[in-house]
């Protein structure tokens, strides 16, 4: 249940209204509370009223709307209900209007008795307000003072007339003519010259009844006034009132009020009535309405005797008979000029002398009251009349008239004297006689079963007064209006005046149906204030009627009351709604139209103190009581055992007061001397027979009587008012003795004792101070006690429950606040959680906890929480006041706030400031480490900053960051364009740009790349400069790395094109070298061919495993160095000097020679073994031997002719090498020397170049050794051994098989030189069942030197003539050898041997060679330049036709030696000089072949030994053709046999 209008408790001050609104409009007061109870609340009306009483008492009235489904049937018989309504003249209801009308009645009566007609004048087209004029003149001091002080203009202004129009003089004339005589009469000036009049004489004039005059004035309206608001009374003539308009206007005869059927007032004398009714003149030319057209009474024409009888009572003279007036009341005579004031003319009507006038006017007026209508109505006929009146009055259907319009019109009508509206009101119709509108049991209207619930409903007004909770139920008498409902049938404007209920009881009114009823209410605390205001504003009414407000006949405008600070509230009661008035609350109102209402009184337990107070108030006003309050209390006390404990407790308290008052009064009476007393059952007497004759109080407890006045009683308060007898003659009548009363009170006390104790405990708990408050558990215990002892569900218990429930809710909320944690730091959506309290609410909640009647354990904890929250607010406010707070401090405060489940308004700003602080700190940190401040970081920070709330520091940082980003993007884009520029920018320009970019405190990706590029370029230039300045020949890998680096640097490098050209030349040289040495589709690389072999004896297994990076077979251990070609290549690349590279290659040669020698002897022994080994594996296929087979000259292994390409018969004289040993084309030396010269010209070191130099040196060395061998005599023994046939093959070939080989073409393994002609005619090889098809020189018959020399001859990848010469020498007859010896130059054997021996020792000595190679590295630069610019001599073909031309041959050989020596000694220091012996050796260098042919001429071709000696040989001397010298390696005989013994 919630009231539609809620008001704060306590007195509500009146609105500061200054009266009615503009133009006199009515301003409605504020609305009273409107309650809409739920079904649960509506079930108990008294409990609900108790619940709303604190609110509704403050307004005096309230409205209750039942639940929508609560619709009781209307139980009245509409056709049988009939009543006689009251007549209500609206302008007689309002107090101030009635005072004005009474004044006009007196003025009219005065002039009527003076024989004149009252004429109300018009001033400024307005009717002159005589009442206001008379009052203002009196306030200013009277007529004489106003005239003396000339205040008429001031009075005219106060009356609302415009100044400056001489209105004051007009008003003065009207006052002097109409009001001044009346005031002189009232002051007694007209009677001062007379003796005291005899007022006891009877008069024949009829007593004047003011309220019998229905019309005080007949108004001639102005032309501008609407006719609907101007009317004439039916009996205006009877009042003899004329209106004197200031301007002639047409008399309007339209009278709206005639339709009302107003009854004619009842006159006591019909004859007088007939003689006094005059007809209104209808002539328009006469502006005055004459009430008297008879001739004036004339005294002048009487007889002489009669004239002598009439003399002036004032002057005693009978003169001036024509001025002598005769009183129509007492027949006294007065001169017109002797009267005060004097009369200028003889009145035309009946005239009364001052004495009779005073006697007539001093008669007391009758009390005002309503008249009963002459007609009896039923509901139907009354409704027809009421609807017709409202419809005609407002000229529209009744249901379309707004309630506001009716309300304003009502208050206008009650305040005007110009219009009289009469309505009728069917009020106070007894429901006992005609039946209630609610259904009752045994009623005349049958009720359906579904409507039977309304029979026993507490809201049925027949049940409410007699319910158990109502104390009126203990009154046995049926009091109409209080215990029995009254019915009210209203029409438009019918009203009920200001009043309070009898005994200040409650009242409840239910509007069954019809149009609304408008109510006005004043709270009970302002009742006396209202009474005082009405007495102040209309004191004349209270002179004759002190209890005027109890008569329900007076109303006053609510605006007037509110102007005097009386609180007034209103409401419109619609059909089906209740209006409840509270004790001593004045209320009034009117009906909006035809309706039917029912009302009754009721009294609750809380009313009992007010009821006793009301009786005391009635005693002071001498107002009778409706029932005896003490009688009701005693009746309730006599039933103490069945009373409700709450009622018993309240009655016990009231009874205690009653006993104390009775005890004191009886003691006072005893002291007065009253002795006799007797018991009397007052309840058996009618109420009018036991009233105090003084104060009208109904006596019950006691009374005083006297034998002198039997039947009369006085209460103990008015003992002295009974009679004049002495008190000892009085008799005290009492109902109970004091001893009877105490047991009755004790019975109530016993009944209520347990409850009282409980209630006392409850009250103490509810009203306890802070330090004495009880716990919530104690409150729950009190509730449990009430339930256990079945105490009634009254206000106290409900209040206790409500307080306990509130405390429990508070405890629950407090616990939630104490336990509550914020679930997230930042909420969605934003805003406030619906369950969170603000800090102010928390503060109020803590205050509420301390204001609770009980103590909660959470209160101090919550107070501490509040203190912490307030501390948090202070700290946050302090922190937020700083220009730039720390993010850590903000976060710390926010972390603290997570403990508070409270809405903190600072959190939003703190989160905003935290984001700002974090952002600023991130910006600051990023700016401090400018090297990591990237463009993306700046953009991200700017994007984050854009999303932040506006703040000065943020905006400044944003501006700086945006400026930095703009500059950074500009320079980054510029750096990007510089990097992508074509052609590329120079290093200096880019360095300048980098220097400028370094001043930007940010990380620029392209700028960093540019800076890195500039640094790389500087490093590159530095490396290039260091390479050029070092004096060393650059290594190819270094050049390639420099070129690759230079190409990757986006900077224009001046040296890069030169290096690229140099690298290109090197690659071109390598391609040329590869074409020279490698056959097509060769599986060997150039480096493999040029370097000593590393895969000897493994049949390529090592190489394959090296390519697959797989481990060697088990049992094989990997060598630490030079194990493979990659090791050798790596060693060459790592060598910094040429001498180191030569040493590495020399070591590789020694390993090669040792491995190959071992392999040769192993294969030879395998093939020459006398026992045939079935497990012997030969050939590439590693299978057993099978004819025909061919033997490799170098590795000495046998190969199936089906597995390899065997040489044909025509090629059988040539040396055959297997696929493993045949590695290159073995070009002649003349084709290799240009490669070396071009390499020296290029001045770049590369592994292939080092290998080529070593190969040439090895070739020359081998040539030298071979020539020494050929020139020595040691070769003859070897020749004899080979020629004697000591060496034979194990598998000689048959003739047939040999011939079969003729069809085989020459394989690529055959050498280019030819053996002697008888080589293939030897028969020693043809008797074996197996034949190799190609025989080799035997190994066992050769010396190690020869064997090594032959072996190295095949290892050399150069074709040399010494190889052919050596083989020819070994395989030819001795005669051929001798012939060859003869054809050689003349040289002693000792000299040749010495020379050859010396050279052989120098070449073949590894220690000496390794010692000399580092010395050769220091070759001075001038020699390098000489070698570089030296043109390589063109190879000349050998001219065998000039064998004697030794000079040319020696010159060509010397040139070859110079090239080799220059390459070997380019690293020698500049101060190193050759010895004379070495110089002479270079100058006298000859072909070291044993059988040198000493060719002469410019076209002598040389070939260098590829072995370890590196000696140069004539191609023709060693049997190497130019093609072989170009495609194949050449190893001299000495190198072939030298290393064999050392590797065994």
Swiss-Prot record:
Record's function text: Histone demethylase that demethylates 'Lys-4' of histone H3, thereby playing a central role in histone code. Does not demethylate histone H3 'Lys-9' or H3 'Lys-27'. Demethylates trimethylated, dimethylated and monomethylated H3 'Lys-4'. Acts as a transcriptional corepressor for FOXG1B and PAX9. Represses the CLOCK-BMAL1 heterodimer-mediated transcriptional activation of the core clock component PER2.
Residue numbers bearing the N6-acetyllysine modification: 832
Annotated ranges, domain JmjC: 453-619
Zinc finger (C5HC2): 692-744
ZnF (PHD-type) intervals: 309-359, 1176-1224, 1484-1538
Protein name: Lysine-specific demethylase 5B
Main location: nucleus
Residues modified as Phosphoserine: 986, 1328, 1456
Family as reported in the entry's similarity comment: Belongs to the JARID1 histone demethylase family.
Residue ranges constituting the JmjN domain according to the UniProt record: 32-73
GO molecular function annotations of the record: histone binding; histone H3K4 demethylase activity; histone H3K4me/H3K4me2/H3K4me3 demethylase activity; sequence-specific double-stranded DNA binding; transcription corepressor activity; zinc ion binding
Domain notes: Both the JmjC domain and the JmjN domain are required for enzymatic activity. However ARID and PHD-type 1 domain are not required for activity per se but contributed to recognition of the H3(1-21)K4me2 substrate peptide. The 2 first PHD-type zinc finger domains are required for transcription repression activity.
Pfam families: ARID, JmjC, JmjN, KDM5_C-hel, PHD, PLU-1, zf-C5HC2
GO CC aspect terms: cytosol; nucleoplasm
Cross-link Glycyl lysine isopeptide (Lys-Gly) (interchain with G-Cter in SUMO2) placement: 148, 204, 209, 242, 274, 278, 769, 1450
Assembly and oligomerization: Interacts with FOXG1B, PAX9, MYC, MYCN and RB1. Interacts with HDAC1, HDAC4, HDAC5 and HDAC7. Interacts (via PHD-type 1 zinc finger) with histone H3 unmodified at 'Lys-4'; the interaction is inhibited when histone H3 is methylated at 'Arg-2' or 'Lys-4'.
All copies of domain ARID, residue ranges: 97-187
Tissue: Present at highest levels in testis, where it is enriched in spermatogonia and pachytene cells (at protein level).
Lineage per the UniProt record: Eukaryota, Metazoa, Chordata, Craniata, Vertebrata
Binding positions (Fe cation): 499, 501, 587
């Amino acid at each position: 249940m919630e009231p539609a209008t809620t008001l704060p408790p306590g007195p509500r001050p009146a609105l500061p209204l200054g009266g009615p609104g503009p133009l006199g409009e009515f301003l409605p007061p504020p609305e009273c509370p409107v309650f809409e109870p739920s079904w649960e609340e509506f079930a108990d009306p008294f409990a609900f009223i108790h619940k709303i009483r604190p609110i509704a008492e403050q307004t005096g009235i309230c409205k209750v709307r039942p639940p929508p489904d609560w619709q009781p049937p209307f139980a009245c018989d509409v056709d049988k209900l009939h009543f006689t309504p009251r007549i209500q003249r609206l302008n007689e209801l309002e107090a101030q209007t009635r005072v004005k009308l009474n004044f006009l009645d007196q003025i009219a009566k005065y002039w009527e008795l003076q024989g004149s007609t009252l004429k109300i004048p018009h001033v400024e087209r307005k009717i002159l307000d005589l009442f206001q004029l008379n009052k203002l003149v009196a306030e200013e001091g009277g007529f004489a003072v106003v005239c003396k002080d000339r205040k008429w203009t001031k009075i005219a202004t106060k009356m609302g007339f415009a100044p400056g129009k001489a209105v004051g003089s007009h008003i003065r004339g009207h006052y002097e003519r109409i009001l001044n005589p009346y005031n002189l009469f009232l002051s007694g000036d007209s009677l001062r010259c007379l003796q005291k009049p005899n007022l006891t004489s009877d008069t024949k004039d009829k007593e004047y009844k003011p309220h019998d005059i229905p019309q005080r004035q007949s108004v001639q309206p102005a032309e501008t006034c609407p006719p609907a608001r101007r009317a004439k009374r039916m009996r205006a003539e009877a009042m003899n009132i004329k209106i004197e308009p200031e301007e002639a206007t047409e008399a309007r005869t339209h009278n709206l009020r005639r339709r009302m059927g107003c009854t004619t007032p009842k006159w006591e004398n019909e004859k007088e009535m007939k003689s006094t009714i005059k007809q209104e003149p209808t002539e328009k030319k006469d502006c005055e309405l004459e009430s008297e057209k008879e001739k004036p009474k004339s005294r002048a024409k009487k007889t002489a005797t009669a004239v002598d009888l009439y003399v002036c009572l004032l002057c005693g003279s009978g003169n001036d008979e024509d001025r002598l007036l005769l009183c129509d009341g007492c027949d006294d005579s007065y001169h017109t000029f002797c009267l005060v004031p004097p009369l200028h003319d003889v009145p035309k009507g009946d005239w009364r002398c001052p004495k009779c006038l005073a006697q007539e006017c001093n008669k007391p007026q009758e009390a005002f009251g309503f008249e009963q209508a002459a007609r009896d109505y039923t509901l139907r006929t009354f409704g027809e009349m009421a609807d017709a009146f409202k419809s005609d009055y407002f000229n529209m259907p009744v249901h379309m008239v707004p309630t506001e319009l009716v309300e304003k019109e009502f208050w206008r009508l009650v305040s005007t004297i110009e219009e009289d509206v009469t309505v009728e009101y069917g009020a106070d119709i007894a429901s006992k006689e005609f039946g209630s509108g609610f259904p009752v049991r045994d009623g005349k209207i049958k009720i359906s079963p579904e409507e039977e619930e309304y029979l026993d409903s507490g809201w049925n007004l027949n049940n409410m007064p007699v319910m158990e909770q109502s104390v009126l139920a203990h009154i046995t008498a049926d009091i109409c209006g209080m215990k029995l409902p009254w019915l009210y049938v209203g029409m438009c404007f019918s009203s009920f005046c200001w009043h309070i209920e009898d005994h200040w009881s409650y009242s409840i009114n239910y509007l069954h149906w019809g149009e609304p009823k408008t109510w006005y209410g004043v709270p009970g605390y302002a009742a006396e204030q209202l009474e005082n205001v009405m007495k102040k504003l209309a004191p004349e009414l209270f002179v004759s009627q002190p209890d005027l407000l109890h008569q329900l006949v007076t109303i006053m405008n609510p605006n007037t009351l509110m102007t005097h600070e009386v609180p007034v509230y209103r409401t419109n009661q619609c059909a089906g709604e209740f209006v409840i008035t509270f004790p001593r609350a004045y209320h009034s109102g009117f009906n909006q139209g035809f309706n039917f209402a029912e009302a009754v009184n009721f009294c609750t337990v809380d009313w009992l103190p007010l009821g006793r107070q009301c009786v005391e108030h009635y005693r002071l006003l001498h107002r009778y009581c409706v029932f005896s309050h003490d009688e009701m209390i005693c009746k309730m006390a006599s039933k103490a055992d069945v009373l409700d404990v709450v009622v018993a407790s309240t009655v016990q308290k009231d009874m205690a007061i009653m006993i104390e008052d009775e005890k004191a009064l009886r003691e006072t009476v005893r002291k007065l001397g009253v002795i006799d007393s007797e018991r009397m059952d007052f309840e058996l007497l009618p109420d009018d027979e036991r009233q105090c004759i003084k104060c009208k109080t109904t006596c019950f407890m006691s009374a005083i009587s006297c034998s002198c006045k039997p039947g009369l009683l006085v209460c103990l308060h008015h003992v002295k008012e009974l009679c004049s007898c002495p008190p000892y003659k009085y008799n005290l009548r009492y109902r109970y003795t004091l001893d009877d009363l105490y047991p009755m009170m004790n019975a109530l006390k016993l009944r209520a004792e347990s409850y009282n104790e409980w209630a006392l405990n409850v009250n103490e708990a509810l009203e306890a101070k802070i330090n004495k408050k009880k716990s919530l558990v104690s409150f729950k215990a009190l509730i449990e006690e009430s339930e256990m002892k079945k105490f009634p569900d009254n206000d106290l218990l409900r209040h206790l429950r409500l307080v306990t429930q509130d405390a429990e809710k508070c405890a629950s909320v407090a616990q939630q606040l104490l336990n509550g944690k914020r679930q997230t730091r930042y909420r969605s959506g934003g805003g406030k959680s619906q369950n969170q309290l603000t800090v102010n609410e928390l503060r109020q909640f803590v205050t509420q906890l301390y204001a609770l009647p009980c103590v909660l354990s959470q209160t101090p904890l919550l107070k501490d929480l509040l203190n912490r929250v307030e501390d948090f607010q202070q700290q946050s406010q302090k922190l937020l006041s700083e220009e730039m707070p720390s993010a850590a401090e903000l976060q710390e405060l926010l972390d603290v706030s997570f403990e508070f489940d409270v809405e903190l308004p600072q959190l939003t700003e703190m989160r905003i400031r935290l984001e700002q602080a974090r952002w600023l700190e991130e910006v600051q940190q990023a700016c401090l480490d400018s090297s990591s401040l990237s463009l993306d970081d700046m953009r991200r920070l700017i994007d984050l900053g854009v999303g932040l709330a506006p703040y000065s520091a943020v905006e400044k940082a944003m501006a700086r960051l945006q400026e930095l980003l703009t500059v950074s993007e500009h320079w980054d884009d510029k750096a990007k364009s510089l990097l992508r520029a074509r052609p590329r920018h120079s290093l200096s320009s880019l360095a300048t740009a980098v220097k400028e970019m370094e001043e930007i405190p940010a990380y620029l990706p392209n700028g960093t790349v540019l800076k890195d590029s500039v640094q790389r370029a500087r490093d590159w230039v530095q490396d290039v400069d260091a390479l050029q300045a070092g004096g060393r020949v650059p290594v190819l890998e270094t050049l390639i790395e420099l070129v690759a680096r230079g190409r990757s640097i986006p900077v224009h490098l001046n040296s890069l094109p030169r290096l690229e050209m140099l690298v290109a030349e090197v690659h071109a040289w390598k391609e040329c070298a590869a074409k020279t040495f490698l056959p097509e589709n060769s599986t060997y690389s150039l480096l493999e061919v040029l370097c000593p072999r590393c895969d000897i004896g493994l049949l390529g297994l090592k190489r394959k495993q090296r390519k697959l990076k797989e481990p060697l077979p088990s049992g094989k251990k990997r060598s630490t160095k030079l194990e493979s070609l990659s090791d050798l290549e790596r060693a060459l690349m790592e060598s910094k000097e040429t001498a180191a590279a030569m040493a590495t290659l020399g070591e590789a040669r020694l390993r090669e020679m040792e491995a190959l020698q071992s392999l040769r002897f192993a294969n030879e022994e395998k093939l020459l073994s006398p026992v045939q080994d079935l497990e012997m594996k030969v050939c590439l296929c590693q299978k057993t031997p099978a004819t025909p087979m061919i033997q490799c000259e170098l590795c000495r292994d046998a190969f199936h002719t089906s597995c390899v390409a065997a040489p044909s018969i025509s090629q059988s004289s040539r040396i055959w090498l297997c696929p493993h040993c045949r590695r290159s084309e073995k070009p002649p030396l003349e084709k290799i020397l240009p490669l070396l010269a071009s390499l020296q010209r290029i001045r770049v070191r590369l592994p292939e170049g080092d290998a080529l130099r070593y190969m040439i040196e090895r070739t020359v060395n081998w040539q030298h050794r071979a020539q020494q061998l050929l020139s020595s005599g040691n070769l003859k023994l070897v020749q004899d051994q080979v020629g004697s046939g000591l060496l034979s093959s194990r598998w000689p070939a048959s003739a047939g098989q040999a011939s079969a080989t003729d069809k085989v073409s020459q394989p690529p393994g055959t050498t280019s030189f030819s053996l002697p002609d008888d080589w293939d005619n030897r028969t020693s090889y043809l008797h074996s069942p197996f034949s190799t098809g190609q025989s080799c020189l035997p190994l066992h018959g050769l010396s190690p030197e020869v064997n090594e020399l032959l072996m190295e001859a095949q290892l050399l990848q150069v074709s040399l003539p010494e190889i052919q010469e050596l083989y020819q020498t070994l395989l030819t007859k001795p005669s051929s050898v001798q012939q060859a010896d003869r054809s050689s130059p003349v040289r002693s054997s000792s000299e040749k041997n010495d020379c050859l021996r010396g050279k052989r020792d120098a070449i073949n000595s590894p220690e000496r060679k390794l010692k000399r190679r580092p010395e050769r590295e220091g070759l001075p630069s001038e020699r390098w330049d000489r070698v570089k610019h030296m043109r390589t001599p063109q190879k000349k073909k050998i001219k065998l036709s000039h064998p004697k031309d030794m000079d040319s041959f020696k010159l060509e050989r010397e040139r070859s030696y110079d090239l080799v020596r220059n390459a070997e000694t380019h690293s020698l220091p500049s101060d190193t000089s050759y010895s004379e012996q070495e110089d002479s050796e270079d100058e006298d260098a000859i072909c070291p072949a044993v059988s040198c042919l000493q060719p002469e001429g410019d076209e002598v071709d040389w070939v260098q030994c590829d072995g370890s000696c590196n000696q140069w040989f004539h191609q023709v001397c060693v049997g190497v053709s130019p093609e072989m010298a170009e495609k194949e390696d050449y190893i001299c005989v000495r190198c072939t046999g030298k290393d064999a013994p050392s590797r065994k």
